[in-house]
């Protein structure tokens, strides 16, 4: 298992059907293949890491520092640079291409993207406040947040107080999203459930940090298929037994009739 991640764009949502009788909502992500730009060793910084570049960028949009960095490299400039720490740096070389194959044996991933911006919102929408009373002395402040401070001491509003403000448009991470399937030919990955952001949102994927002992839908599907096969075998054996019993009954009846 590797700690290297990938970058993609959210295409949209769909639905996958399984023989168990379950339909699962999935998010489809188009993966951008990465390329190893630089290798960082313990001699340089005290740890082993790999710098991976994603996406195309015009040379005119590069900063002077990035132009100097890429002038020493044999690879073409990339729009995004991500650094991933690895255990065995000998497995990587500059210019190596990295794609969906790194998630071949991975069941769950962590996804980071920017949520949809919802503009300026009040506390009832933003934080699910109940608001003030509909009557009984309340006038023109039914949806307000109420008191935000105390009195002369401390004489200020503390930082982090839940108040009206800009809602959404923030970087959010979803943990342990199940990989339903991956299409290596078209660089598509299907994740269970939804992820933050609208269509064409930039998405960062990485191996799940929290390890969970949870059966995936595919594993559950296999278990159900095995159970169905066992039931089929049991039904076949029952039919065979019933046919044999009936045959023996007929034989006994025939013998009795002959004696009579």
Q: What role is predicted for each listed range?
A:
Residues 1-260:
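Extended basic (Lys/Arg/His-rich) segments that typically form rRNA-contacting surfaces
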């Amino acid at each position: 298992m590797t700690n290297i991640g990938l970058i993609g764009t959210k295409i949209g949502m769909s639905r996958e059907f399984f023989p168990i009788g379950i339909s699962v909502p999935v998010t489809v992500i188009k993966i951008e293949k990465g390329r190893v730009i630089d290798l960082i060793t313990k001699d340089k910084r005290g740890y082993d890491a790999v710098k991976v570049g994603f996406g195309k960028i015009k040379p005119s949009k590069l900063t002077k520092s990035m132009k100097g960095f890429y002038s020493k490299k044999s690879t073409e400039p990339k729009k995004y640079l991500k650094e991933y720490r690895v255990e065995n740096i000998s497995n990587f070389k500059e210019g190596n291409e990295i794609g969906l194959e790194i998630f071949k044996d991975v069941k769950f991933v962590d996804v980071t993207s920017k949520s949809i911006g919802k503009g300026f919102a009040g506390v009832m929408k933003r934080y699910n406040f109940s608001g003030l009373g509909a009557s009984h002395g309340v006038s023109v402040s039914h949806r307000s947040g109420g008191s935000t401070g105390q009195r002369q001491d401390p004489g200020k509003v503390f930082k982090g107080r839940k108040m009206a403000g800009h809602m959404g448009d923030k970087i959010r991470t979803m943990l342990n999203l199940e990989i339903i399937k991956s299409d290596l030919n078209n660089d598509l990955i299907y994740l269970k459930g939804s992820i933050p952001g609208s269509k064409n949102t930039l998405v960062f994927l990485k191996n799940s940090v929290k390890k969970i002992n949870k059966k995936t839908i595919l594993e559950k599907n296999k278990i159900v298929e095995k159970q169905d096969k066992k039931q089929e075998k049991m039904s076949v054996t029952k039919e065979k037994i019933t046919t044999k019993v009936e045959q023996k009954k007929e034989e006994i009846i025939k013998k009795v009739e002959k004696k009579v």
